[in-house]
Amino acid sequence: MSILKKPSAWDIVYSVAMALACVISYTVMTKLHAGVEGHSGLLGGLWAAVSTAFVFRDSREHSLSAGVGRLIGTCVSFALCLPYLWLIPASVAGMGILLAAGTLVMLLLQRREDIITTAATTIVVMVVAVLNPADAWKQPLHRLFDTVVGIVIGVAGKWIASFAFYTARGEPIR
C-alpha cells in the first residue's frame, strides 16, 4: 500500500496556479518597490508572495475567508506598529509589547485564528525597523500594501484557476 496518492488533474492545476500566483505577486511587488523607492523590493516581494500562498486555499470561499483574515490581522498590526514607530524607536522590548497588544486586540475582536497573522506581521515590521531605523515608520505601510497586493493576486488567481478548470470540465465551480 502506497502512502502517496496519484495527483488528480485539479491537484496539478492547483499547484501550478498557486506557484504562478506567488511568482506574479513577488514580481509585481519587487518592481513596484524598485520604481517607488528606487531600490530592490525583495522584502516586499517576499511578503506579497507569502500573502498569496496564505490565501490560496482549497475552495474559492476558503480563499476569500483567508484573505479577509489576513487583511484583518495585518490591519491590526499596522494600527499598532505605525503610531509606535512614529513615537518610539524599534526594539525587541517594543516588539514584545506590540505582540501582546496585537494578541489582545485579536482576542477582543474574536479573531483568535488570525492572531498568528497579526504576530507574524508585527515581528517582520519590527525586525526590519530595527535593521533600518531611518525608515522604520515606513515598514507598516509597506507591509500593508504588500499584503493587500498579495491577497488580491492570490484570491484572484485561485478564482481564475477554479473557474477555468471546472468550466472546462463542465463541473460546478469550487
Can you name each region flagged by the protein language model?
Residues 1-174:
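Alpha-helical transmembrane segments and their membrane-interface boundaries
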